Amino acid sequence: MTTSEYGSRRSDDDQWDIVSGVGYTALLVAGWRALDTVGPQPLAPDEYAKYFIAASGDAYLNDQLAHPPTSVDETAFPRLYGVQTRFFDDFFRSAAAGTKQAVIVAAGLDSRAYRLEWPSGTTVFEIDLAQVLEFKARVLQRHGVEPKARRNAVAADLRTDWPATLHAAGFEPGQPSAWSVEGLLPYLTADAQDALFARIDDLCAPGSRIATGALGSRLDHDQLVALEQTHPGVNLFGDVNFSALTYDDKTNPAQWLAARGWVVEPVRNTLELEAGYGMTPPAVDVRLDAIMHSEYIVATKP
């Protein structure tokens, strides 16, 4: 891997596929889900993640899967992404009881339409660039994996008029819906974050719910490299500097939603989620959260 290919600065109209730019983050996270799945105590097993890594041909991630890390430091990122995956899995399991519409924003290689048990009649709308959605569907079809809900791929760039594309895919704004915005916000400017939430708010009927969050609301590559000195093997980013793909200006999602009348549950970080899942966060997880500032939010529109 090289920083020139994956760590280039963003532009307002940049594009990507599954092995470049922002798209590579989806592949990397899928790799960590696959690693957590083969670990001793996976919180949210994803048996399909390994298919994406194999199909990508990415040498680094395929080597990781062939020789899975074992130490508490080396498994930190897979473990923490397992925690994040469990959070959003639980959100959809809970929200599905009150809606037949689930929307996964910037779906990437999210396999919840295929992994989770959805109530009969549920439609899962996956929003992302066409080439990303096509890669996912093609790989899973090759392995005979079928979605467990009606899956509607919504090929759209979030910087364009994606609500119109969502409407065209059959979304009904007059009915309650459940939305996930997972790991996306660091890759958007504050203005883009505001626009995203405003559009979601406009599309949500009363009773709708949203979950948003990321392992890192900020990512300082230099601090991560420095952490390697005391926690060897923790930096599974290799030489890729993903902080070059993120923006420093941020919106506070909890405040934004509350100001518009949404009922926001207490904001939690990774360490609090781990404790809630019966885990004792090891020292490396505490250090990582201090660097990355995780936050996870659930809100309901009354």
UniProtKB/Swiss-Prot annotation:
The keyword DNA-binding does not apply. S-adenosyl-L-methionine binds at D128, D157, L158. It holds the Pfam family LCM. One of its GO terms (molecular function) is methyltransferase activity. InterPro entries: Ppm1/Ppm2/Tcmp, SAM-dependent_MTases_sf, SAM_mthyl_Trfase_ML2640-like. The keyword rRNA processing does not apply. Disulfide bonds: none annotated. SUPFAM superfamilies: S-adenosyl-L-methionine-dependent methyltransferases. Keywords: Methyltransferase, S-adenosyl-L-methionine, Transferase. Gene3D superfamilies: Vaccinia Virus protein VP39. Exhibits S-adenosyl-L-methionine-dependent methyltransferase activity. This is Putative S-adenosyl-L-methionine-dependent methyltransferase MUL_2961.
